[in-house]
Amino acid sequence: ILDKEGEGDSLSVESLNGKYTINDILVTSNNDKWINISRPTSQACLTVVTNSNSLDEATSYEFKNFIDTDNNDFSPNNYTCMAEDKNGYIWIGTNKGAIYLTNPKLATTENNQSMRCTRVKLINEEGIPYYFLDNTIITTIKVDNGNRKWIGTDGSGVYVLSEDNQEIVHQFNTSNSPLLSDKIYSIEINENTGEVFIGSDKGLVSYKGEATKGKDDYSDVY
């Protein structure tokens, strides 16, 4: 780790010792570090290193399992990506779909082995509730300035979830859009213009989104 003076130091995180694959790191708005261990399957977990004033005071917490709001166990074999939305909720992509944590600070407690999570539940045309992207491999999650979640999948294209998580705003795939492939690797959003860049196994496309970043000064608006 480099400090602002450019001096190097190391941080020993016990829960990361011996882990092979760290494939995502999320620094949250309160400066906690969420670290995703994806492989091997036996080691798949999430580690949170808490915000602290010094490296010596940093504390880490590890957890693997979740209980959803229907009191069902949710234990994926692989954690793939993370994002923080405008409400401070932490979104987590897995091989079984996407979940989010409405109170992520509970992850930094000793009794966190079965964290409470929320799975997005929508209503189909027959009026029957279902879990959004259930058992779908999630590859990337990005949040735009309108708090919509852009969710990339391994084979099903891109889904855009509404700000309140109650409806699918857009669904992009090779059949209904210029998307080059339904196997999505990455999504990035230009906050100033709203443009969304989507990377896949067959190349890059962009979409002109509607949610742009607000200004600090609107004195030129009449």
Residues covered by each model-derived region:
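Hydrophobic beta-strand positions in blades of beta-propellers and related beta-sheet-rich domains
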Residues: 1, 43-47, 63, 98, ...
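Short loop/turn segments immediately following beta-strands, especially the blade-tip
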Residues: 1, 49-58, 101-117, 162-168, ...
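Short coil-to-beta transitions that initiate beta-strands within beta-rich domains
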Residues: 7-30, 65-86, 121-146, 174-190, ...
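Long, internal scaffold/assembly segments composed of regular secondary structure
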Residues: 15, 24-26, 34-37, 42-53
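Short loop/turn segments immediately following the C-termini of beta-strands
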Residues: 30, 38-41, 46, 95-96, ...
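Conserved beta-propeller blade signature
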Residues: 32-36, 89-93, 148-152, 194-198
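Blade-level signature of beta-propeller repeat domains, shared across WD40, Kelch, NHL, RCC1
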Residues: 96-99, 104, 183-221
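Long, C-terminal catalytic modules of enzymes
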Residues: 146-147, 151-155, 160-163
